[in-house]
Structure formats: C-alpha cells, structure tokens
Amino acid sequence: MRTIRFNNNRRISFSLFLREEGRRETSVSNASGDKIPKGKVPFLLLFFLLFLGSCSSDFLDNKPTDAVDSGLVPVPSNAERIFNGAWYNLFEYGTTYANIGYRALMCLDDMMADDVVSRPMYGFNSSYQFNDVVMPSDGRTTFAWYLMYKTIDNCNTAISIQATGDDDTPEFRHAQGQALTVRAFCYLHLAQHYQFTYLKDKNALCVPLYTEPTNPNTQPKGKATLEEIYTQIINDLNRAKGLLDGYVRPNDKSKYKPNTDVVNGLLARTYLLTGQWDEAAKAALEAAKGYTLMTDAKNYMGFNDISNTEWIWGHPQSVSQSDASYNFYYLDVVEPDSYNSFMADPHFKDTFTEGDIRLELFQWMREGYLGYRKFRIRSDQTGDIVIMRSAEMYLIAAEALARKGQLGEAVKPLNTLRNARGLADYDLTGKTQEQVIDEILMERRRELWGEGFGITDVLRTQRPVVRVALTDVEAAKEYDCWQQNGTFKKYHPEGHWFTSFPDGTKFVPNSKYYLYSIPEKETNANTNLK
C-alpha cells in the first residue's frame, strides 16, 4: 500500500485565513470516530491562492508540488493554470488516508445510506454509524468544508479575470467556462449536504455564497438561502455553456475538463433537485448523447478507466499523480492490500433480476461479507475516478418524466439502460405513477452504487435511510466465501449491523444525521454563520 505525503500546509480555514497567522492545532478521526492528533500545522496567510502556481496546464502529466510561483497572477494567460490548480485541490488535496479529495466525500455519502455494509476497517466506519460529519468538531467535517471553499475561491480567481483584445482568446474563455462549471459543481454539493432539499423549503438558510476572490480584508458572509444558491448555480452553468460552445476535449485524458456535455449533466442534476422536470429531462438526454452504454460485465467491472464510453466527466490518474487513487483501497473488495471496507447489503443483491450483467459482480467473500466487485484498483496502484456518466443521465430523464406524469415517455430512457444491462423492457401495465418512480429510484441505487449518490438521494426524495438486518433464517445460511488465496471457506452471511441513529432512534426522513455540519472553527471565526 503506497505512502502519501499530505499537504497539510494548505489546510486553511476559509474565514480564519483572512486574518489568522502562525500555527494551529488540528486533528482527524480514526475509523471509530476517535481523535488522532496531527500536531501543529504551519501555514502562511497569503499562500492560500499562490499554491496554484505549481499547477501547469498539463498538470495531469506532471505531479504538482507545493512550491509557490510568485509569477502566477490573475491575468488571462494564467486562467487555465488557475483552473487546473482549483481542480487539483478538489481531487488531490488530502489530510489523512481516509480524506483524499472529493472522492472521499463520495465514499462517505454512500456509506451513510442504504446499500453499503461497512466491514469494520479503517476509513469510513464512523460514517456508516453517522458519527463524523454530523459533529462540528470532527476532522472529516473540517476537511469537507475547506475542500469545497478553497476550490470555490480558486475558481472565483479564474472567473474574475477580465480580458480584452488579443487576450480574449478561445483558450481563456474555455478556462473561465470550466471554472464556472466547477464552481457550480461545488455549490451544488454544498446545497445538497448542508441543508434539506430545495423542494422542502427553498427559503431555508444553507451556506455562504462567495462569487469574488477573497483577500485578508474580505468580510465573512452569512448563510444564503437555497433559492439564492440554486439561482447562482443555474446562472453559472448557463454562462459556462456559452463560453464552452465549440470546445472539444482533445482526448479521454482531458475528460476532467468540463465541456458542454458536463454542463448539461449538471443542469440536469440541478433541475431534478428543483423540480423543473421538463428542463431536467431535456438537459439529461442532451448530456448523454455520444456516450455509449456498456453491455458487457467485463467493461462494467473495474470502474477505473476514464476512457470508458459511458463516462462524461472523470478525474484521470497516473503513476506520478495518483493520491486520489487511494480511495480505491476502500472500494476494491479483491485487492489483498486494501481495507475492503465497502461491502454490499445482501438484500440489495435481491433487487437484481436474472440476466442482469451486474449480477456477475457479486461474490461472497472474506468473513461472510457480500462483495460487489465494481471498483478495482489497477496493477500500477492507480484508478481513474468517475464523476458523471450517461447511465445517470438516462435515469434523471426517466425520473423527471415520471414525476411529470408522462409514464410512457419515462420508461423509454429507463428501458435504454435496462436493455444495455441485459434486461427486458419494464412492464408498465397496471403501474401507478408512484410505482414507476419507485422502480426508477431503485434502478438508480442498483446502477450508481458506490458513486456517491446514496445520502443525497435520501435527502432529495425525503425518505429515511432503510437498513434491514438479516433475519435469523437468513443469518443461519452458509455460503462458500472467496478468500484472498483463491480458496473458498464457508461462512454465515454478514448484513447490516447498524440500523438506527447513534442516539438509538429509528431512521426518519429529513434527519440532522444526514447533513454535514459546518466546522466549529469556522463558526467560531465567522459569527455571521450562527
């Protein structure tokens, strides 16, 4: 298992960095939520933005360093480099082995939901027990907050650049469009995790909304409403679409750079969250064009290659730049050196029907856990990270049309996906609108397992987390379980072992346990958040 050097000198409070100097204490959580001292973390005020200088336009080919490039200033010729720095921060910045970039938050979100069973190992065991991001003092709470706002601030710098004359090049406009897209992506994440869903109360206060670069004189803001945040997201994406018109990514390794397909995909997600069904379906189907669905389990297994025909947006990894790949050590259930933390609920497997190519991914293994061999780290210990793919877009279109009441139209994109997975068309005969929506939502769970949609779908649909322990009859069965040496050993099955909130109460809709907290250090520094 590889060693990673964490760039803790960049771990700066979004409010505190405006005025605090010197050194401060920081801590992280272990698998059970206990604190592990990390010691004193040094940082310099003005280095918050300057670290971007280490990220060149071909940063995915050359590992960025922590060196400060004093020549990097917010001018049109540097817009692409500043965007690349924002992207690198979002996916490669880490504070612990269990907190490396945005992929760690995707893991967290699925571990908190229905269909993942935690094999009690290092990494996300506390997330499974709703015992980390709900606590303002937790290290992961701190990591999640600063990861987003540092990325937003970097994007704001790129967006703020003005260009005229010869400086107003297509490359400059594309970089600004990409920065707008990533800013919208970050605010969409914040809106879904720090407040209940828009359709519950669009006037609910959520998080601060910053659209200009900050500096030591910036006054910390209070919380904006969900409506204000979603308005900004849609405005950013529509502006980005214009700037990215005509932009073509040169190759698959450039899929980290947003194009209009990515913008349409984010618009589809946003419109689904805000109940704009026609717009959601239209944007989703537009985003999916040209991204062919997989029809073979061999192509499905691994989920580590950005050249996958379904992938619209992803984060590539190379041997020289691969910190984000460490997240595969939690998801990969086969790799001997992995933590193998993410196992499947046996009841989840029961929702699949015969002929589904995804059934081949299930394997009883280890001490009786059900493995889902969807994610595999490559032999060079790297793995590309999926952010958006066409299967999700078909599901968004299906759900949006079903919620509008157009059931006949809704099953068309649903069946496109089902057929690709080896299944016959969904039989609409005698089905109610609610039944069709439920089937589409269940298909989302089957298709997007492990891709970071678990708890946000729970929040969006205002339902409770559902975890059902194995019955005595189910637990008494024995299965041949694959072992790492290639042999098989009989074990009783393992299912959900944490089926209520930490206070002992039952899972309910719209619970505080589903939301991320704002770090206490942030609320202490910014009284406008209280």
For the regions a protein language model found, what residue spans apply to each?
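Short, surface-exposed recognition loops and adjoining beta-strand edges that mediate ligand/DNA contacts
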Residues: 67-72, 97-118, 195-203, 207, ...
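Extended ligand-binding clefts on enzyme/binding-domain cores
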Residues: 83, 91-95, 228, 274-275, ...
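Conserved, well-structured interaction surfaces
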Residues: 121-194, 224, 242-245, 380-385, ...
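Membrane-proximal, proline-rich intrinsically disordered regions
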Residues: 55-106, 352, 426, 430, ...
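Structural register within alpha-helical repeat arrays
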Residues: 176, 183, 190, 267, ...
